[in-house]
Curated annotation (Swiss-Prot):
Residues 1209-1218 have a biased composition (Basic and acidic residues). Keywords: 4Fe-4S, ATP-binding, DNA damage, DNA repair, DNA-binding, Exonuclease, Helicase, Hydrolase, Iron, Iron-sulfur, Metal-binding, Nuclease, Nucleotide-binding. GO terms for molecular function: 4 iron, 4 sulfur cluster binding; 5'-3' exonuclease activity; ATP binding; double-stranded DNA binding; helicase activity; metal ion binding. The gene is addB. Residues 281-588 form the UvrD-like helicase C-terminal domain. Belongs to the helicase family. AddB/RexB type 1 subfamily. Residues 1160-1169 have a biased composition (Polar residues). The heterodimer acts as both an ATP-dependent DNA helicase and an ATP-dependent, dual-direction single-stranded exonuclease. Recognizes the chi site generating a DNA molecule suitable for the initiation of homologous recombination. The AddB subunit has 5' -> 3' nuclease activity but not helicase activity. This is ATP-dependent helicase/deoxyribonuclease subunit B.
Length: 1218
């Protein structure tokens, strides 16, 4: 055995290649010359040998890793015929073992189903095998704490069970080197071979076992080790400070010497003391003295006569992106000015996952060819998504979510548009499960105009069903046959047949060719490899568990465990690329220029890992019992120092070390100790700060990478800033290159364009809305909030995707419908609201709610147990509302006149009509939930109720700005149609009267007045009490908790007619002083103030109508305090409102106090609003019959007609137009 020993850069690998070259030249047809290197370095070493101008080829030379060496041995002497269960297969087997033996475990029982547990156990068992620890050794541990003993016994059990599962039909790759070592003596190609072992700093016990076996067959084994020769010459038993980085190579050297002596092999040394790699004095000094103590300062640090004597530069950066941008600019500068090839440069970091995404984005933008040296996880590949979602679809009986995940993988022969339309249809009508199966066509669209679209959807459904149903039938368990009877092999076969039916291999080949044609060679490699990798996983599943009967949930869990760990290793697809890798896994042994990224504390050096089944203390205890495992703790610290040493000594000519000063959130980051050490060794070390806002012409990146910064500077220009001379020149250059950079035209267009909408042409606005503008309160309120939102919803008629779920509007509709039908039932039975007991009212609510529940959202309330329980809660909520309304009836004399009465053209009540300019007019329509009336003396008073499924408040401030006009508009409509209401309802004849008043005999002589308008919340309040409440008191308190909100007439007699106990009113929210006066802040208005409100309504309707017909669609959302129109707006992705743009500004609405409100309303430029505004047309018998029909004097038919969207769930207005 011969050792080549030397520090970094002394030429160990070069000497190995030279010796191989010399041997092959002297004996061209001799025995194999084997170069044994780490797995990740095989491709690089093959390239080095092949491109060596002196080698003349590598006919005798073979570059092998230990794994490839095993394949060669098995191919010559046999023993490799068993199916290989790889890492993915082992994790699947272990997941199954955990599920099967959970009851036999104590330590690992609770975490048996935890994600990642199978990974930890697989790593532990692999470590046992690599370090040649047997289950019996684990069981033989004594005199340890109970937890450690239990843990080792359970691991020994799982270890043995895994070996049993593999059986005689399969083998574990972790066992291969042990098998290889036993067969090396029979391998002809190793008899008398010369072997060079290069690139290792240490070996596992299995690898040492293989080397020991080769000592008996090889003519000579040469091992190169990164070790200071002085350490061997001195023979010192302990390491001095700074020498710990050679800890592992020295331990390895000692182990190899022991093997050689045991084999009675001769031992010789080649000590390399001269460094040949470094072309800069600074790099040479860094290698020799980085770990030397006391510190050896670079003697030529201030020598200004030599051009760049150091070859080292520091790049502090604002953040990670600025750091990577700066590295990319420097790479392009090196290529442009110094003629560097891309392969001359490497980028390494200790935190590759943290930098990978940024590197990909930035290097692609700069058009820098690169290769990321890491294994790619493929769990998010469409093929893996297809496998997992297909199984879940069967498992969950064709549920929507997994089924459409499956369909969106692009493997089904349906366009994305067809899949999207199908998804919208299924979401809207809650289609899942059995609805997909059979030959019954879907016909959920009620509109016959959709027949053609329905036919297309059924065609798509049939294609999907024909492809997927055989898979469903093949793997679905059959309980009628005595339980699940499907084996793993059968499920796997069904999966394979599904993949073939969907032509997955052909799709993958197309994707690979497309990636190749656009120059993405790494992506092409991945698409070419993914099919074989997935089939390998399925083969391993069958090899390990093929005949085992398994239910789908366990199968899915095991397959997911395997696919989550599936990773693909790619070889560099091109020759001239920048190599990007991790500090502990880089293929490039040396490079001309190296960029070391992320030199921050906690990253460089990395923190020792404590992941695994055993913690550091347990490992030490096992070591004391003779169980030697992978080094941890202090040894990991030494290993981190070695990684830093190799990174700092890899560059021949130039070393750049960069580090961000802040993280993504602007928090400061600490610099690595490596930086402090470098500054001690090189006091004059140059630094260059990297920023995203670069103004130096010499540092300009590739034009494509400049485009984001170009857009940023154009944005600043748009906001009024000026461009620097440099960016003026850049802009002129881009404007001259628009053919090559089409994005420039879009960016420049963005500079000129304004994110604003002007006005629609008036003819178009009139065509869109009509000469007689028929509208609703909800539409005008939306227009008041934001004209563009109104245009999007009612002009463009955009709507959100329908979803089969019970939304707040659905619950509001349910409440309205039940309350309406409950009132009709009372009227038919001649009952008053306050007459029924609690039990009687609950029975009547049940009777009226059941048929309504059948019609809501395609019977959604009956679709599952959750919704059936929710139905009960909704009934309970309505029942409480009924009890509160009954209390109103008991306490007052106001009677329900009409229910859900509509006003508008051709409706029971006439519309509110406002003349507009140019002969146009606005007609307001809507539907009033409930109109109550009372006759007091010779006066008739009307009160409006509007049901809300939430707490609702109305204020004069909201009314002034048009944000809440519903109650006011309804009151105005009721007063305009009052004569129709009174004559059709028989109010005068049926009035209960009030104290001190008698019913009127002639309503024609009565004057009709507003009594108020109120929001009634349909809610079931939850009470808090520190004492136990009896049922009767609880019922009273819950009724008191429901507060109506609105404004009432400031007339004591009228208020007494609403609540006899006015002084202690719990129903109206009115507070009185001791003298009987109304307290300040009570929600009361005089009749003159009600008239002013109606005047303001007319003014607002006129202004809104004029603005609508003038085509106002401006993006001007309101803002008042913390509230804006954008908070819950669905159209934000459409309008792109940005308050930072100069043309995008909120309409700031001032908060109008009550006193100011009345001042403003009185001064509005409008004709005096008459106390009794006449109806638009004289009501005739037709209007009265319509009111009787629509007002609800007869029960509803079997089909429930759902209305608009006026409230969150209780919309009542038809928002069409004439």
């Amino acid at each position: 055995m011969r050792f080549i020993v030397g520090r970094a850069g002394t030429g160990k690998s070069t000497l190995c290649r030279q010796e191989i070259h010399k041997e092959s030249q002297e004996h061209p047809e001799g025995l194999p010359l084997i170069l044994l290197v780490p797995e990740q370095a095989t491709h690089q070493m093959e390239m080095s040998l092949a491109h060596d101008p002196q080698s003349g080829g590598i006919l005798r030379a073979q570059v092998l890793s230990f794994r490839r060496l095993g394949w060669r041995v098995f191919s010559e002497v046999g023993g490799g015929g068993k199916a290989v269960i790889g890492e993915v297969g082992k994790r699947m087997l272990l997941r199954r073992l955990l599920l099967n033996h959970r009851s036999d475990l104590r330590v690992f029982a609770r975490s048996a189903t935890r994600p990642g547990m199978a990974d930890l156990l697989a790593q532990a068992i692999a470590e046992f095998k690599i370090y040649r620890i047997t289950p019996d050794q684990l069981r033989g541990i004594e005199d340890a704490d109970e937890l450690l003993l239990q843990k080792t016994h359970e691991l020994a059990f799982l270890y043995e069970e895994l070996n049993k599962s593999l059986g005689t039909a399969a083998r574990d790759p972790d066992d291969e080197l042990n098998l290889v070592a036993g067969k090396i003596s029979q391998a002809p190609f190793l008899q008398g071979a010369k072997i060079w072992v290069d690139g290792f700093k240490g070996f596992t016990p299995q690898e040492l076992y293989v080397i020991q076996a080769m000592l008996g067959t090889a003519a000579e084994i040469t091992v190169s080790l990164p070790l200071d020769p002085e350490l061997l010459k001195a023979g010192t038993p302990r390491f001095k400070p700074g020498e710990e980085l050679f800890y592992e190579p020295r331990q390895t050297y000692q182990g190899l010497v022991d093997l050689a002596r045991e084999a009675k092999a001769s031992i010789s040394h080649v000590f390399l003391t001269e460094t040949h790699r470094f072309e800069k004095a600074g790099l040479k000094h860094l290698e020799r003295f980085y770990n030397a103590y006391p510190t050896q300062t670079f003697p030529g640090g201030d020598d200004s006569t030599a051009p760049d004597p150091l070859g080292i530069a520091l790049f502090p950066a604002a953040n990670k992106r600025a750091e990577v941008e700066g590295v990319a600019r420097e790479l392009r500068r090196l290529a442009r000015e110094e003629g560097r090839t891309w392969r001359d440069c490497s980028v390494v970091t200790r935190d590759l996952p943290g930098y990978q995404g940024i590197i990909e984005q930035v290097f692609n933008a700069h058009e820098i060819p690169y290769f990321l040296d890491h294994k790619r996880p493929v769990i998010h590949h469409p093929l893996l998504e297809l496998l997992l979602s297909a199984i879940e679809t069967v498992q969950k009986d064709w549920a929507y979510e997994p089924l459409f995940r499956c369909l969106k993988t692009d493997f089904f022969p349906c366009s994305k548009d067809r899949i999207d339309r199908l998804e919208n249809y299924c979401l809207a009508y809650g289609i899942h499960g059995s609805a997909w199966k059979g030959n019954r066509s879907w016909s959920y669209y009620p509109d016959p105009n959709h027949k053609e679209e329905t036919a297309g959807l059924n065609e798509t459904r049939q294609i999907i069903y024909d492809l997927f149903s055989p898979f469903d039938q093949a793997i679905r368990p059959h309980p009628e046959a005595g339980g699940p009877s499907v084996t793993v092999a059968q499920i796997t076969e069904a999966i394979y047949e599904l993949l073939i039916r969907l032509k997955v291999p052909e799709h993958l080949q197309e994707w690979a060719e497309a990636a190749h044609s656009r120059g993405d060679l790494a992506e092409a490699q991945l698409q070419n490899q993914i099919w074989d990798a997935v089939i390998q996983v399925l083969d391993e599943l069958v090899a390990g568990l093929g005949e085992e009967v398994m239910d789908l949930s366990d199968f899915a869990m095991i397959l997911t465990s395997g696919l989550e760990n599936l990773q693909l290793g790619l070889i560099p697809p091109g020759y001239d690329q920048v190599l990007v890798g991790s500090l502990d896994r880089s293929r490039n042994p040396e490079t001309a220029v190296l960029f070391l990224l992320g030199a921050n504390d906690g990253i460089l050096p990395g923190k020792p890992s404590d992941e695994g089944v055993f913690d550091e203390l347990e490992r030490l205890r096992l070591e004391s019992k003779g169980i030697m495992l992978a080094p941890k703790g202090k040894v990991q610290v030494y290993e981190e120092q070695y990684f830093i040493y190799t990174a700092l000594t890899r560059a021949r000519e130039q070393l750049y070390i960069s580090y961000p000063l802040t993280d993504e959130e602007g928090r400061g980051l600490t610099v690595s100790p490596v930086i402090h050490r470098l500054k001690m060794i090189f006091p004059g070390l140059p630094e260059k700060y990297l920023s995203l806002d670069e103004e130096e012409p010499g540092a300009l990146p590739h034009p494509y990478a400049l485009l984001p910064a170009y857009a940023l500077h154009l944005q600043k220009l748009r906001q009024g800033s000026s461009l620097s001379p440099l960016w003026q020149a850049i802009r002129l250059w881009f404007l001259s290159q628009t053919a090559a950079f089409p994005q420039v035209q879009l960016l420049e267009k963005g500079l000129r364009d304004q994110n604003e909408e002007g006005k629609l042409p008036q003819p178009l606005a009139r065509q869109l809305y009509g000469k007689r503008l028929v509208t609703s309160v909800s539409r005008l309120e939306l227009f008041a909030r934001c004209p563009f939102a109104h245009f999007a919803q009612y002009g463009l008629k955009l709507k959100e995707r329908s979803n089969y779920r019970l939304s707040p509007p659905d619950m509001g509709q349910f409440f309205h419908a039940v309350l309406h039908d409950y009132a009709i039932a009372l009227r038919e039975r001649g009952l008053d609201w306050g007459e029924l007991s609690k039990e009687q009212s609950w029975q009547l609510v049940n009777e009226t709610a059941e048929p309504i529940a059948l019609q809501l959202q395609n019977k959604i309330l009956l679709s599952n147990a959750r919704y059936r329980y929710l139905t009960h809660k909704l009934k309970r909520t309505v029942h409480h509302a009924v009890r509160v309304l009954g209390e109103h009836a008991r306490q007052g004399v106001f009677l329900p006149m009409e229910l859900e009465v509509k006003f508008g053209p051709q409706e029971a009540l006439p519309p509110l009509e406002v003349p507009l300019s140019g002969g146009n007019s606005l007609l307001l329509r809507g539907q009033i939930d409930r109109i109550d009336g009372a006759v007091l003396g010779h006066e008739i008073y009307l009160r409006i109720f509007d049901y809300k499924s939430r707490e609702a408040h109305v204020s004069l401030n909201q009314i002034y700005h048009g944000l809440d006009l519903q109650l006011l508009a309804y009151l105005d409509a009721a007063l305009q149609g009052a004569q129709i209401l009174v004559s059709s309802s028989g109010l005068a004849e049926g009035s209960k009267g009030s104290e001190g008043s008698e019913g009127s005999e002639d309503s024609e002589d009565s004057t009709i007045h507003p009594a108020g308008f109120l929001y009634f919340p349909v809610l079931e309040p939850q009470l808090k009490s520190k004492t136990l409440l009896y049922p009767e008191q609880l019922e009273k308190d819950r009724i008191k908790a429901v507060k109506v909100k609105g404004y009432l007439l400031a007339d004591r007699q009228v208020l007494l007619a609403m609540d006899r106990d006015l002084e202690n009113s719990s129903l109206l929210g009115i507070k009185l002083t001791k003298s009987g006066e109304f307290k300040k802040g009570s929600p009361i208005l005089t009749e003159e103030q009600f008239a002013l409100l109606r005047k303001h309504l007319q003014h607002f309707l006129r202004c809104s109508g004029e603005a609508l017909l003038e085509g106002d669609i401006s993006i001007t959302p309101y803002r008042q305090g913390k509230h804006t129109a954008c908070q819950f707006c669905s159209y934000k992705p459409l309008c792109h409102f940005d308050p930072y743009l100069p043309e995008n500004n909120y309409r700031n609405l001032p908060v109008i106090q009550d006193e100011e409100f009345w001042q403003r309303v009185q001064s509005q430029d409008s004709e005096q609003y008459p106390e009794q505004h006449p109806p638009t047309s004289v009501p005739g018998e037709t209007s009265r019959r319509a009111l009787q029909k629509d007002g609800g004097n007869s029960p509803r038919g079997q089909e429930l007609i759902w209305l608009g969207e006026d409230e969150a769930g209780a919309g009542k207005e038809d928002d069409g137009h004439e």
